[in-house]
Amino acid sequence: MSFRTIEWRDDAVIMIDQTRLPMEEVYQRYTDFNAVAEAIRGMVVRGAPAIGVAAAMGVALGAREIIADTQESFFRQLENVCDVMARTRPTAVNLFWAIERMKQKALSLKGNPLETIRTGLKEEAIRIEAEDLAICKNIGRHGADLIPEGATILTHCNAGGLATAGYGTALGVIRAAHEAGKRIQVFSDETRPWLQGARLTTWELMKDSIPVTLISDNMAGFFMSRGEITCCVVGADRIAANGDTANKIGTFSVAVLAREHGIPFYVAAPVSTLDLSLADGSRIPIEERPSTEVTHIRGLPIAPEGVKVRNPSFDVTPAKYITAIITEYGVARGNYTQELAALAAV
């Protein structure tokens, strides 16, 4: 890929600013963990795996900022850093997975000089980034086998390199199929209200010369009814033990339409997105974002001032609508409670 979503460079976190795409390709440099937290909250970086990487790097930055004379003081302040990161966005489980992994790394180094702990946390964050890229490649490899020659694939939101450390989950499947020489094309839902499909997915696919057609969200059923969609591939922000999947708002609607038209609906996500502590999706927290994301586009009002707005950022697709869940360790195909538990144990 010709861009980097996030990286650690010269003791700073460098992120492509996704609020500026596709008009401007701007990279932001962060040396303060609070600024990284605000970047996550403000969607400078977004997508569950990328949020996890950003949170890990934010914790590593925070550890470098801590001034402490004792281990107790250091770990007390580090807990505060982790709490700040955890409060940024509630739905993406990768955020909490990455923070917990950083906590465990710090605890494993307890008793060593503080500089050793700081270095260990930086190395762990960089390792999480590298692992995520490898994971996405494996997801792509497993998923590409499900994509037939000549397929037209509908995707929703952006689950590509911009949503991960690189390559992507849903777009990783698409990229892998393209790299395998399959003739494919993509239909990208625009994904209101934040327009990740219009702004980000099309930008990524065009950079990779993968044929892509942009459609508005309310056109999906039309193209399915005409037989123009072969399959759907989306990412995920949290998957419950039974396969219920939280993803960008509008995913549920696409899944229902796909089921009605007999079109396979695939979810592509790393095992770190599984939340086996939840029996089903009913307890997945759903983030509500500011009303201005609905009433304004690029700062311009499109609705009457003072109108009541609801803006849930995610919805939950029941497992019965999902044909298969593609992970880095293999594909779960319907008996999700058993199969996802087995994949998580690999």
Swiss-Prot record:
Coiled coil: none annotated. Pfam families: IF-2B. Substrate binds at residues 46-48, 89, 196, 247-248. One of its GO terms (molecular function) is S-methyl-5-thioribose-1-phosphate isomerase activity. The record marks 157 as: Transition state stabilizer. The active site is at residue 237. One of its GO terms (biological process) is L-methionine salvage from methylthioadenosine. Pathway: Amino-acid biosynthesis; L-methionine biosynthesis via salvage pathway; L-methionine from S-methyl-5-thio-alpha-D-ribose 1-phosphate: step 1/6. InterPro entries: IF-2B-related, IF-M1Pi, IF_2B-like_C, Initiation_fac_2B_a/b/d, M1Pi_N, NagB/RpiA_transferase-like. It comes from the Bacteria. Its EC number is 5.3.1.23. It catalyses: 5-(methylsulfanyl)-alpha-D-ribose 1-phosphate = 5-(methylsulfanyl)-D-ribulose 1-phosphate. Catalyzes the interconversion of methylthioribose-1-phosphate (MTR-1-P) into methylthioribulose-1-phosphate (MTRu-1-P). Belongs to the eIF-2B alpha/beta/delta subunits family. MtnA subfamily. NCBIfam families: eIF-2B_rel, PRK05720.1, salvage_mtnA. This is Methylthioribose-1-phosphate isomerase. It comes from Trichlorobacter lovleyi (strain ATCC BAA-1151 / DSM 17278 / SZ) (Geobacter lovleyi). The gene is mtnA.
